[in-house]
């Protein structure tokens, strides 16, 4: 069992906030894309800031190299999601399915990465959480 310091609790709360932001900015992106809304550019810009926000929160605990790696994996998560949304909107089933497979493979990479940087973060649990997130987003 892991015991947490005050700093770790602050990180967990910050991560919770960032995940919430990730979810609603992703939803805004999907809605803006699907409905051809005029706010797609600022919504996309804000959504793509989210990986950097995560990296900034992780840096004091894990250093720049680890934070940058997470930022890259999470940016890929968003870019793949955009490919999936755009393929679905264009009714390109093969492209959508390829993006969907890539999205789940990226979730596997994120789960593995997070389990390697923190002994309290278990790969199977992260994978289940990320898959739930993807399924609810689809």
Q: Where on the chain are the PLM-derived regions?
A:
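Disorder-to-helix initiation segments
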Residues: 4-15
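An amphipathic alpha-helical core segment
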Residues: 107-138
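N-terminal extracytoplasmic segments of bacterial inner-membrane proteins
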Residues: 13-31, 71-85, 128-138
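Short, motif-level signal for alpha-helix interfacial/capping segments enriched in acidic residues
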Residues: 3-4, 114
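Alpha-helical segments in soluble extracytoplasmic regions
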Residues: 32-65, 73-114
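Short, solvent-exposed positions on alpha-helices
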Residues: 13, 68, 94-97, 124
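Short alpha-helical hairpin
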Residues: 1-2, 20-28, 47-53
């Amino acid at each position: 069992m892991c015991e947490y310091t005050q700093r770790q609790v602050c990180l967990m709360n910050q991560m919770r906030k960032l995940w919430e932001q990730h979810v609603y900015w992703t939803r805004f992106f999907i809605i803006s894309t699907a409905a051809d809304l005029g706010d797609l550019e600022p919504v996309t810009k804000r959504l793509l800031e989210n990986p950097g926000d995560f990296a900034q929160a992780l840096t004091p605990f894990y250093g720049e190299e680890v934070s940058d790696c997470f930022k890259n994996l999470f940016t890929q998560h968003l870019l793949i999601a955009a490919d999936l949304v755009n393929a679905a909107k264009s009714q390109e089933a093969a492209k959508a399915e390829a993006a969907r497979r890539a999205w789940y493979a990226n979730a596997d990479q994120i789960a593995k990465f997070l389990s390697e940087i923190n002994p309290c973060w278990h790969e199977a649990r992260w994978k289940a959480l990320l898959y739930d997130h993807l399924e609810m987003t689809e």
